Amino acid sequence: MSINCWRSPNRAIGKSSGGVIMFKTILFPLDRSREARDAAQMVADLVKIHQSQLILLSVVEKNPPGQDHEAHGMDSPEAVAKLLEAAQAVFSQQGIATKTIEREGMASFTICDVADEVNADLIVMGCRGLGLTTEGVAESVTARVINLSPCPVLVVP
């Protein structure tokens, strides 16, 4: 028996196989936070269990005019590339192939846009990751992704 779970009337989350929802594509947005490192093992376990495609995403936030990445507190494109390479190596050691994506933009919106583009069945994130909203107020990127995501979000404490 196959059960479909629905994220909207037109788009399935994943197929159920014997009562277990299958995640074909898992998106793992990462940064240099401890929470992202802690979530990595959960991601590896899920990918192995579901034989999923793993997509690693890192977002370089746009800087206000006249500020460099260091002054704004965000990673440079070079640092993000190194982060993705290091993460790819960690997953490779566990026999997990990955695809990497690097984007520029507001983290929460970019994560949701990429999830939609790659037809992700699941986003896995650490529980903290602060970014500034357009109003300049600190808000959790994770909380915003939960509210905007086109697919389920697993938050790892």
Swiss-Prot record:
Residue ranges spanning the membrane: these are none
Q: What family name appears in the similarity comment?
A: Belongs to the universal stress protein A family.
Listed SUPFAM superfamilies? Adenine nucleotide alpha hydrolases-like
UniProt source species: Synechocystis sp. (strain ATCC 27184 / PCC 6803 / Kazusa)
Q: What CDD domains does UniProt report for this protein, alphabetically?
A: USP-like (cd00293)
The source's superkingdom equals Bacteria
Protein name, entry field:
Universal stress protein Sll1654
- What Pfam family is a match, any one? Usp
InterPro entries, per the entry: Rossmann-like_a/b/a_fold, Universal_stress_UspA, UspA
Report the leader peptide range: none
